[in-house]
Amino acid sequence: MNTVSHKYRQSALLLLTAAIWGSAFVAQQTGMDYVGPFTFNAARNLLGGLTLLPLIVFFSSCKKRTLPPDASSENGTQPKTLWAGGILCGIALFVASTLQQIGIHTTVGKAGFITALYIVLVPVCGLFLRKRVQPKVWLAVLIAVAGLYLLCMTDGSFSLQKGDLLVLACALGFTIHILVIDHFSPLVDGIKMSCIQFFTCSILSAVCMALFETVNVSNLLHAWIPILYAGILSSGVGYTLQIIGQKGLNPTMASLLMSLESVFPVLAGWIFLHQALSGRELSGCILMFAAIVLVQLPGFSKTNAVS
């Protein structure tokens, strides 16, 4: 099952996920010019869930035609496992995406790179869950962190503002999200779990929206393009690819691959928002790519999970 071709296929899915997420930072920051964080996340996750419903119906009908009448449509998986995974993922996603959206007022590139500090938090938290990490993978993590530093701290000093601290807290939320997916993705249908997580996150965001924000229809209409992009592509497509792509991969390797989402907002911010890309930031991008290449070498193919 853990063949080289399977590893590269899953890696390609996570790289595509990173590209989608990275470009979405621009949409998230633009959307915040018109609506609050809870409104934005309620709308984008509702769209994400609705995007997946036709796929679920289509694949379910295909399974019914191909499976024998007495076969289990969930391959032996209990529905409660699917719902537990989806709801827990949705709660983690709600916490992480809310903190990220509130803290998005920092520069697009900086927000992306601080968020990607989950590449350190995932292996550290994984140790408590008895998931070993090869020394060479730790080396790749250190190289990636060096790249993060070059891109985040452009003046050479380690200074964090209020918005940066919120985004840093969201990195812990995404760490929990990755580890929850690592646990449940081999057990359940990835598309169904993704759909449940979106509706869970949307409901939680909508409750907070009603309590803490005033919804303005005119502002919502002005933000419809960023919401559509973040909802359909970043949420509906991106997070679903994450669940499918993480299946069978070590969570630390998966987090390193997805950390390239931080390179894409820098490039997107440079292209669309005219945020300057210095030689220091370019060096950071190169180090990030080097770390990703390193974990793809043959010596990194082992899963190293302890049962």
Regions found by a protein language model. Give the residues of each.
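Glycine-/small-residue-enriched transmembrane alpha-helix faces in small-molecule transporters
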Residues: 1-43, 90-91, 95, 99, ...
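Juxtamembrane helix-entry segments on the extracytoplasmic side of multipass membrane proteins
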Residues: 6-11, 34-42, 78-82, 138, ...
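Hydrophobic/aromatic residues within transmembrane alpha-helices
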Residues: 31, 40, 44, 103, ...
